[in-house]
Structure formats: C-alpha cells, structure tokens
Amino acid sequence: MAKVSAVEKNKRREIMVKRYAARRARLKAIVMDQKISLEERFKASVQLAELPRNSAKVRVRNRCEVSGRPRAYYRKLKMSRIALRELGSVGHIPGIIKSSW
C-alpha cells in the first residue's frame, strides 16, 4: 500500500489540472501562435508561468486504483501488476484467467 498522503496529493493535483485545463490550453495556444506579436506571446508566457505548478498535467502520476502503487501501472485497467495478479487469480476481473500451455 502506498502512503495515503501521496495518493491524496495526487488526487489534489488531478483536481487542479481539471480546474486550470482550459486556461492553460488557451495560454499555450497564444504562446505557440507565430502570427501573434512577440509582446502578446511573452505576456501569455508570463501568465502561464504564474499558474500553479500542480495545474500542469505532467505533475500527475498514474497510480493503481486498488493499492495506490505508482509503478508497473496498466492504463487500461487502472491498476498495478500486483493488484492485477491478485484480483485476476481469484476471478474478480472478467476475462482474466491464469494462463497455461
């Protein structure tokens, strides 16, 4: 099990990303647009830098929904390899069975 504080911090970051997503996308579009004057682009760049760091999508870590583990994460299932193995072996995940050949 991961530390509860780490999991909660990641949840707060996810909320912050959703809250600032539209504003961040608008400012990034202005910064990247070559047709806009350099002064306006610089102003947008400064505004982008003033946004909270945790509002950047890069700061969010994929974590297992079951255990909170940050590594060995399967995106489709939203869980770690360990949780996948445990839940799959007892039959709690539809379509997942232990292989034998």
Curated annotation (Swiss-Prot):
InterPro entries: Ribosomal_uS14 (IPR001209), Ribosomal_uS14_bac/plastid (IPR023036), Ribosomal_uS14_CS (IPR018271). The keyword Transferase does not apply. GO terms for molecular function: rRNA binding; structural constituent of ribosome. Keywords: Ribonucleoprotein, Ribosomal protein, RNA-binding, rRNA-binding. The keyword Ribosomal protein applies. Signal peptide: none annotated. One of its GO terms (cellular component) is small ribosomal subunit. One of its GO terms (biological process) is translation. Gene3D superfamilies: 1.10.287.1480. Belongs to the universal ribosomal protein uS14 family. PANTHER family: 30S RIBOSOMAL PROTEIN S14, SMALL RIBOSOMAL SUBUNIT PROTEIN US14M. Part of the 30S ribosomal subunit. Contacts proteins S3 and S10. This is Small ribosomal subunit protein uS14. The lineage of its organism: Bacteria, Pseudomonadati, Pseudomonadota, Alphaproteobacteria, Hyphomicrobiales.
